[in-house]
């Protein structure tokens, strides 16, 4: 018993050492980030807690976004990839469990020895088997971890694409509304210029003003009229067709409709704490899961260098006569060890390649975090500046009305 306990402890220590050794050469990511954003945001709530349908509050825009998400080809492809990775992850999880199989067979063998006589040897049987690989070095455990990380990465990539599409559709929608408003203002200005031309003509014909005043009014009218075709082209090409392309409409369909009324968003948008914003970014999460998958890939490659132990348990019945088939049961246990002996460095090269893949994923993760940190800082500063500018313009408008 004491000797068995010693062997068990030694074996456990060997397994633990192998598991730790698998990733000991993997360098942890280095993130040299400032303690806080330049903007100094400390909101306890965040925009990430608000659904896009609540944030925009525009029925036409929300319908357009939803239909875009339902029809966009990239979104559909990303959803299919998520399903693919989910099923592959199920395969990796099932690999750690025993494999059950069953077989029913029958054959009849005829032998002719030296052309003297024929002998018939019928055989009927049924058997079931259970095979299981003992995960000594963590091959299957690392493979499961790798599959899970790849599945989660695909989910985060889908969420990142969804977030990008929502932002793109909303941006194009508001740009289109701005063009509509600009066109409306230009048309109103054109009508004013037409009245100015009429009055300038009357004054000139009455001798009250010189001809240059009348000609100047005509120039201003023509200049304003020239703006309308360009604005209509922008609305058609840059606005409606861009929305239709993202929406997934064919060229024969009409572009989605939108109201011309001015959109209002009440209240200040809660930005949130920088660390929370970084943690909840889908692209950051996807990069982090890709890093975890690469780390698990190192573990798989490392464990693949060691022997693999398989057990098979088979039992059944077999007889040459069907009526007596249950009189001859059988069973056996088979164990096998498969060990790499000499492969000209293939296993070591595979392990080194996995380490290089991990380094790539680590550097991409570090780069992504730095990029997102800067994007978040710039977005917060831009949002505050634009909001202050809008408030000042609204004050000027109110003062002009008064």
Q: Where are the regions a protein language model picked out?
A:
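Metallo-beta-lactamase
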Residues: 231, 282, 361
């Amino acid at each position: 018993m004491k000797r068995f306990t010693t062997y068990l402890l030694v074996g456990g220590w060997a397994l633990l050492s192998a598991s730790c050794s698998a990733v000991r050469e993997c360098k942890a990511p280095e993130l040299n980030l400032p303690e806080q954003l330049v903007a100094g945001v400390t909101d306890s709530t965040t925009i990430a807690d608000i659904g896009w349908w609540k944030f925009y509050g525009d029925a036409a825009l929300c319908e357009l976004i939803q239909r875009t998400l339902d029809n966009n080809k990239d979104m559909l492809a990303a959803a299919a990839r998520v399903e693919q990775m989910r099923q592959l992850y199920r395969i990796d999880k099932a690999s750690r469990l025993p494999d059950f199989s069953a077989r029913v067979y029958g054959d009849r063998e005829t032998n002719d020895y030296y052309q003297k006589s024929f002998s018939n040897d019928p055989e009927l049987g049924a058997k079931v088997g259970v095979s299981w690989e003992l995960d000594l070095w963590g091959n299957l455990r690392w493979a499961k971890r790798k599959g899970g990380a790849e599945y989660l990465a695909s989910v985060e990539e889908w969420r990142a694409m969804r977030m990008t599409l929502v932002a793109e559709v909303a941006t194009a929608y508001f740009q289109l509304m701005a063009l509509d408003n600009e066109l409306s203002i230009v048309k109103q200005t054109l009508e004013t210029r037409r009245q100015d031309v009429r009055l300038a003509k009357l004054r000139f014909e009455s001798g009250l003003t010189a001809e240059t005043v009348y000609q100047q009014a005509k120039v201003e009218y023509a200049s304003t009229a020239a703006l309308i075709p360009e604005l209509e082209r922008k609305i058609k090409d840059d606005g409606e067709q861009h929305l239709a392309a993202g929406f997934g409409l064919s060229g024969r369909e009409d572009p989605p409709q939108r109201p011309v009324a001015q959109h209002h968003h009440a209240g200040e948008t809660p930005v949130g704490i920088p660390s929370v914003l970084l943690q909840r970014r889908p692209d950051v999460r996807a990069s982090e899961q890709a890093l975890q998958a690469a780390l698990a890939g190192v573990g798989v490659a490392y464990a693949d260098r060691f022997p693999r132990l398989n057990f098979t348990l088979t039992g059944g019945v077999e007889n040459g006569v069907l009526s007596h088939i249950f009189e001859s049961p059988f069973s056996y246990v088979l164990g096998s060890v498969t060990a790499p002996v000499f492969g000209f460095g293939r296993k070591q090269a595979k392990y080194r390649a996995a380490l290089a893949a991990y380094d790539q994923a680590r550097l991409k993760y570090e780069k992504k975090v730095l990029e997102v940190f800067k994007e978040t800082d710039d977005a917060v500063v831009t949002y505050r500046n634009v909001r202050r500018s809008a408030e000042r313009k609204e004050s000027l408008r109110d003062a002009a009305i008064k």
